[in-house]
């Protein structure tokens, strides 16, 4: 049985995560106090210290992005591309800063990578986040400066000489994406890398007061989600019997029923529905448990939800109903089942 960190359902693949679109800004945020000095006006290099990356940190820590990354790391084409880049980068660059690798082979491999649906989904969500985040506008502009790549290379060279980071970077160089995934959730390593790059840590990551109590509270509050995700029927029953909220929402507005149906844990879904869980609960993207079950082809969960009054016509933020989501994900058996119910 997978752990809860390995079993977090993705947002149905039609989601663009554009519900929090913000106006773009070209105003350069101020550097954090105590940060190294910014480049002078005559230095066109990239000022890593002038940008708040907390928004991107939130995206990268999104459970759906993490699971996409894990799936991508297992893709043979992506690993081939990563190995090719690893072989070329350590050998140095030609004049002009271009890595020494075969462009034709690179393009062929990249084309294979782009055929990976998980890669396209993650690239789209990250791209949207970059474009919509006003803090990232000056960062993206700065990346266009030739001096930025030189400054980035200098930072990387310094990191490789850091006694704490050197073995970690060496392991990532040798192991590729799979080794990188090992450190994805390591807050200490990520903080050290951020510090070495001069990237300010978001305020939510710097608050150290009473961390253990907060974490314990989170775990206790999410026990219903955890047991439902893991298919732990007895644990779920015990959690509900001890006062657990059957319709408790996580930070994305997802209830335990969303999780159970996303994973196909039909017995847990039945327990929740028997306890009176809302079959039409919506998350922040207005996805219902039926959207999740339909998108992942969980036919038994779809049938169970329909028997308990789940709405086939409920639309999410992209104006997609469960039938649309199932069709987008080529879940043809589920499409037939939903269409049959819709026309009854």
From Swiss-Prot:
GO terms for biological process: regulation of DNA-templated transcription. A 1,2-diacyl-3-O-(beta-D-galactosyl)-sn-glycerol binds at residues 225, 248. GO terms for molecular function: lipid binding. Residues 13-27 have a biased composition (Basic and acidic residues). It is found in: Cytoplasm; Nucleus; Plastid, Chloroplast outer membrane. It is a peripheral membrane protein. A 1,2-diacyl-sn-glycero-3-phospho-(1'-sn-glycerol) binds at residues 296, 298. GO terms for cellular component: chloroplast outer membrane; cytosol; mitochondrion; nucleus. Residues 1-50 are annotated as: Disordered. InterPro entries: Ankyrin_rpt (IPR002110), Ankyrin_rpt-contain_sf (IPR036770), STI1/HOP_DP (IPR041243). Keywords: ANK repeat, Chaperone, Chloroplast, Cytoplasm, Lipid-binding, Membrane, Nucleus, Plastid, Plastid outer membrane, Repeat. ANK repeats lie at residues 219-248, 252-281, 285-314, 318-344. The ankyrin repeats (ANK) mediate interactions with hexoses-containing lipids present in organellar membranes (e.g. chloroplast), such as monogalactosyldiacylglycerol (MGDG) and phosphatidylglycerol (PG). Exhibits chaperone activity toward chloroplast outer envelope membrane, mitochondrion outer membrane, endoplasmic reticulum membrane and peroxisomal proteins, by recruiting specific proteins containing a single transmembrane associated with an AKR2A-binding sequence (ABS) and subsequently binding glycolipids (e.g. monogalactosyldiacylglycerol (MGDG) and phosphatidylglycerol (PG)) present in the membrane of the target organelle. Binds to chloroplast outer envelope membrane (OEM) protein targeting signals, as well as to chloroplasts. Binds specifically to two chloroplast glycolipids, monogalactosyldiacylglycerol (MGDG) and phosphatidylglycerol (PG). Interacts with APX3, APX5 and TOC34. This is Ankyrin repeat domain-containing protein 2B. It comes from Arabidopsis thaliana (Mouse-ear cress). The gene is AKR2B.
């Amino acid at each position: 049985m997978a752990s809860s960190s390995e079993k977090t359902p993705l947002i149905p693949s039609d989601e663009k995560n554009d519900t929090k679109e913000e106006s773009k800004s070209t105003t350069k945020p101020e550097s954090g106090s105590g940060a190294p000095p910014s480049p002078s006006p005559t230095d066109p290099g990239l000022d890593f210290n002038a940008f708040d990356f907390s928004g991107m940190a939130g995206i990268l820590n999104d459970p759906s992005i993490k699971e996409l990354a894990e799936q991508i790391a297992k893709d043979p084409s992506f690993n081939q591309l990563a190995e090719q880049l690893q072989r070329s980068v350590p050998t140095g660059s030609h004049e002009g800063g271009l890595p020494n690798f075969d462009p034709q082979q690179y393009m062929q491999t990249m084309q294979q990578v782009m055929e990976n649906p998980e890669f396209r989904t993650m690239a789209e969500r990250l791209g949207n986040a970059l474009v919509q985040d006003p803090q990232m506008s000056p960062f993206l502009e700065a990346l266009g400066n030739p001096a930025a790549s030189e400054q980035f290379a200098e930072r990387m060279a310094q990191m490789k000489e850091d006694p704490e980071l050197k073995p970690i970077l060496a392991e990532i160089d040798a192991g590729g994406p799979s080794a990188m995934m090992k450190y994805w959730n390591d807050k200490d390593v990520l903080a050290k890398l951020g510090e070495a790059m001069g990237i300010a840590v978001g305020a939510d990551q710097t608050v150290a007061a009473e961390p253990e109590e907060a974490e314990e509270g989170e775990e206790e509050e999410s026990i219903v989600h955890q047991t439902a995700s893991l298919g732990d029927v007895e644990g779920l029953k015990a959690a509900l019997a001890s006062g657990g909220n059957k319709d408790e929402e996580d930070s994305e507005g997802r209830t335990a029923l969303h999780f159970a149906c996303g994973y196909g844990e039909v017995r847990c879904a039945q327990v929740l529905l028997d306890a009176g869980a809302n079959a039409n609960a919506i998350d922040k993207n207005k996805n219902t448990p039926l959207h999740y079950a339909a998108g992942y082809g969980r036919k038994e969960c779809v049938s169970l939800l329909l028997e308990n009054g789940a709405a086939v016509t409920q639309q999410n933020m992209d104006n997609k109903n469960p039938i649309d989501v199932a069709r987008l994900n080529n879940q043809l058996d589920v499409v037939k089942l939903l269409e049959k119910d819709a026309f009854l």
